[in-house]
Amino acid sequence: MSGPLELPLFPSCYDCLSWSEDGELAIAAGDHVQILTPKNAAERLGHDTSQSPINNWHSVRFRVNVFTNNEWPTIYPQNRDNFSLGAEQSLSNVVALAWSPPGLAKYRRCVLAVLTSNLLLSLYEPVGSQGKWTRVAILNGALKTYFNSIVQEDGMLLRKSNIRAFAWSSPLKLPAERHITPYSVLPAESRWGFHLLSVANDDNDVVVLRIHRPPTGLGAPYEAGVLSVNSFQDTDENYPMLQPSSIFSEILRSKIRILSMSWGPWFHAKESASGFLAVTHGTALKVVHLDVKVLSPPPETGSQPQFQIKAISKDITPKFYEGLGGYHFTGPLAWMNTDDSHTVCLAAGTLAGLILIKASKEPHQGINPSSGQVRLQELLFYESPENDSETEPLRHSEPISAMIVAMDTDSQAPVLYLATAGGFTAAVPFRDGDDEYPIFAVPWKDQLDDVRERYDFDRDLGGLAVARAWGMASCKGMIAAGITVHPGDMIEYRTAAEERLTIIMSTTAGSQSDGLESRSVSDSSPEYLRQQREAALGYILHFEDNNEDRKPLSLSVLYATACCTIIESKNEALLSQAHKVLVRLATITGVDLNDELSKCTASRTTIAPKPAEMLDGPGGQMFERCEICSAGIAWYSTEEAQCATGHIFGMFDAALKALQEDIMLTLLPVIVRCSLTSLAIQDPGSSKVCSSCGKEYLDEDSIEPSESDVSYTCRTLFDAFDTCVYCNGKYRA
């Protein structure tokens, strides 16, 4: 059955939905977070289409309000300005959550950041073979470490380390350089970029952090470094409607906090980049300009990141627009632009409407600094009249509870979607150069009305039911909107058993959907798959030619790659390079490789297993041997492996995985060789698979420490090919 998803929970905050680029939909539900992951086509094959749409999703629910004493130390009473009784005594419910851009977590997935009401910001990701969601970092410690040398008073240090709001920036990617070497791969900083996170603390400091995952598993899973700090202590622009000298105004301004923020686009220069960060400081809107310089350290940096970045930030609100002081900004905030547009638009929620601030890109790109004109448009929320006789349309004054920017699949232009706590929804498309932006209906308006009318009919409310929006999220042309429905003419009594959150799924064009379709290989023809595979083979075979200063790869991986090329490839240049690598291996080890060298020009040949005297002799470590009987392993296929005595590797592993995932096991062919290193996967627990196409790979974390050269080689190769060689899908354990 196609339709909205109904979940037995109630959201604990506005903007309660966040959708990662990997397809995982996170929902803030009090002291829990619920994550919905779409099932792939094979998993949905045996399900009845008449069942509820929720059956098309995997559902995981985990607690986020349980902390150890090391994670959340005991806080003793402080003075009135530093002690937050509500935060310390709260139930630590979720007040905000957001996925990071892809590339930060293990297997280049997304990390989930969760802010709880005790003012702690945590990072979560699935850990272990069972994929249990676990807290892997608390970012308040990075603030405490930074401010510890600056602030001496314990109470002020507590305020500096409490986090009130946060926002992920879009990935800051290094411009891709033109590579002239064959089979080269862009660095991770160009594929995934740097991951920056802005946080606002209890002392109204805006801190920009760089979050990164160390290359090895030693120490903390994630590290956070402070790049810049901006302090907003001036409160004169807040609450302009109040008498500045009144006691009430003074009390209000003493409690001002930064509660929402949003990153704008990056503008790239030759060796630097600049961007904007908009924040709501009380009722005022502030704009921070960030200049980032990328430093390339020498290669002898050990476990440190290959590239370092430094940042300088400053408040440019007066330069950005001088006439913002008369508005009561409440948030949320969002930016709209395209790569080829001449303008950028900042959308900011106000007390009873929306402000659109349109500015030229040219001053920020260094093209024409004198052409920076900023235009302002104020939008008020009016209900569309049902008939021509209505002269006074209903105006909505509720706060904006959800706002996102999604790319329209038809026009390929960004569209701002918003919803209020009173059920008003609107869509504002971005139009480069237009002075006025129109308001349109959202594509899921009919679905929302159907949910509300069904609730109204079931309870005989006479058309007085109201729908409240709690959050919106978008992913790959899909939009999810979370709503609840309530009686509009009475006090509502609701028990925990009656809590319901309805998630409406829609495309940007307005068609109804059950969710994301599973990712598939764009071209599954043998020729396309061979080309994808040859790109990885060529990278390994040309590894030392492209950079002689790098540590060489493992001899066993080089030999396996050369054999795989002989068996599979028809590329003469690649076969010639395999011949060159085999000659180098024979020279280094002194092993007789004439059999392999003679087959570099043959087609669809096999390579016999090595006898025991060669396996035990000099250079024998580069040949594979059976872990059961120590016999040699033949090369007859790039997908299967069998030793001289008949042991076939991977059958138990494939059967176990099929049993765990409740799918039928296909006996032929069985993927038993790593799709990147070409090594035979003999241990059932030493592999990982592509979550899209199912190709099997060796897990670099499962390699024994004694095999240091193989471990280094696998980590080096999987750093370069951190997604599936064939379909660019993400790995999973």
Labelled PLM ranges:
Residues 1-26, 31-45, 52, 79-82, ...:
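C-terminal scaffolding/assembly regions of large eukaryotic complex subunits
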Residues 1-5, 23-87, 120-146, 154, 190-195, 199-361, ...:
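Beta-propeller domains
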Residues 8-20, 86-108, 154-192, 250-272, ...:
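Structural signature of eukaryotic scaffold interfaces centered on beta-propeller domains
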Residues 21, 29-31, 108, 115-118, ...:
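Short loop/turn segments that connect beta-strands within the blades of beta-propeller domains
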Residues 25-26, 112-113, 198, 277-278, ...:
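Structural core positions within WD40/WD-like beta-propeller blades
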Residues 31, 39, 103, 118, ...:
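Residue-level signature of beta-propeller blades and closely related beta-rich strand-turn architectures
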Residues 34-38, 97, 121-126, 166, ...:
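WD40-repeat beta-propellers
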